[in-house]
Amino acid sequence: MTNTAHEIPGGRIESFSLAAGGGVPLVVLGGVETGFRPLGGTEQVLARRWEGRTQRRQVTVLDRPIPDNPADAERIMHPRVIADGIAATLRGLGVGPVAIEAESGGGRISLWLTVDHPELVERLVLAAVSSETPPDSLMAERMRRWITLAEAGHWGTFFAMMAQQMRAATETESAAFGAAARLQPRPATPERFIGELKATLDPSSFVTDRLGEIAVPALILAGEMDQVVPLASTQLVADRMPNALLVTDPDCGHTVRSSFVGYDRLVERFLAEGDR
């Protein structure tokens, strides 16, 4: 297990690697909440979550960029800029081409990575992904509300709202965000989270018009009860990509990795197909 930092223009990206089997290497990207705190210090949690993937392949978990200047967060946290930083990081690690397993905001970053650096990507696993955030959508409205609360430092209210919106519409709350709401923590690097949310609302981050260029096999998973990224948004991504398969869970909300029935089994089978 190794944790290293990689310099990129205006900041750095931390990576955590688990070495193992000889299949196509896997790169893992989380959602926008990844920006709450640096990757360092979470290694044991990451190892427990991803050690199952290492039976067949090396796994590298990538953090969001850490800007040298916090005031530069919105620029460096733009999904396309992050994708360029990830490309530089993978080349520095000597890893690639790779499979990508990404969730939510990490999915849009992965789409840009595949469009701009196609030589680095062999397969995509995208959970709760959207390629755009229409300004008049409920998704955009909720993100703007998150930004307002975060900038005001109202973290208790913020996490309580997240606990409700991350759950499936039929659940009481999302466990992880519910616990955070009760603890009312202040994230270590809120500027990264806020910066990525603002960039995600910027039309320059929308990648819908480029989806037809992505020819690699893609497994796209969505919860039909997702209150953050509606199923229609994820369906749009699957429809525009020529080699994408959409699989849905009727009872799952936004937390696809932890709540989608059979998630790991589906992903492992899809990744194994690329090892042949």
Regions found by a protein language model. Name each.
Residues 102-106, 110:
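Gly/Ala-rich beta-loop-alpha elbow adjacent to hydrolase catalytic centers
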Residues 111, 115, 123-151:
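Flexible "cap/lid" loop of the alpha/beta hydrolase fold
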Residues 81-98:
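Conserved acidic catalytic loop of the alpha/beta-hydrolase fold
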Residues 7-71:
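Conserved HGGG/HGGXW glycine-rich cap/lid loop of the alpha/beta-hydrolase fold
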Residues 135-138, 155-204, 210:
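Conserved alpha/beta-hydrolase catalytic His-Asp/Glu region
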Residues 243-276:
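Catalytic active-site module of serine/aspartate enzymes centered on a nucleophile-bearing elbow/loop
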Residues 214, 220-222, 226:
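Short beta-strand/loop motif that positions the catalytic acidic residue
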Residues 227-233:
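Conserved alpha/beta-hydrolase "acid-adjacent" motif
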